[in-house]
From Swiss-Prot:
Belongs to the protease inhibitor I7 (squash-type serine protease inhibitor) family. The keyword Disulfide bond applies. It comes from Lagenaria siceraria. One of its GO terms (cellular component) is extracellular region. It is found in: Secreted. This is Trypsin inhibitor 1. The record marks 6-7 as: Reactive bond. The modification Pyrrolidone carboxylic acid is found at residue 1. GO terms for molecular function: serine-type endopeptidase inhibitor activity. Strong inhibitors of trypsin.
Length: 30
């Protein structure tokens, strides 16, 4: 199970996101 804090973060790449979050199509970490 991925550990992804539920924090609103804009992103361009997965590396912009925290922990195991990835950058989704709409430019938000999730």
């Amino acid at each position: 199970q991925r550990r992804c804090p539920r924090i609103y973060m804009e992103c361009k790449h997965d590396s912009d996101c925290l922990a195991d979050c990835v950058c989704l199509e709409h430019g938000i970490c999730g």
